[in-house]
Amino acid sequence: MRITSEQAAAIRQEVTRLAGDAARVWLFGSRVRDDARGGDVDLMVELDEAVPEPAQLAARLSAQASRAMWGRKVDVLIKAPNLQTLPIHSIAMTEGIRL
């Protein structure tokens, strides 16, 4: 995994602050592969309750996670009961690492 434990903790803290204690966060994409270089940070936040404004939540989470990653670009997917589940959500859960 190509983020530090401090960065992972900061991301978890921001996800909890913005999405609640029950939120689960997954790191996926190139950052889970130690042999990869560069790349943005891909996160999926999984929630048990409906999200009324998922785009706003994703944008807030992305901005806060980017700060924790020293300005690195962070893409955030939201998985919630009221949102369509896409193949990328399954990829994030099967190939990703839960933070």
Regions found by a protein language model. Name each.
Residues 42-46:
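Short, aliphatic-rich beta-strand segments
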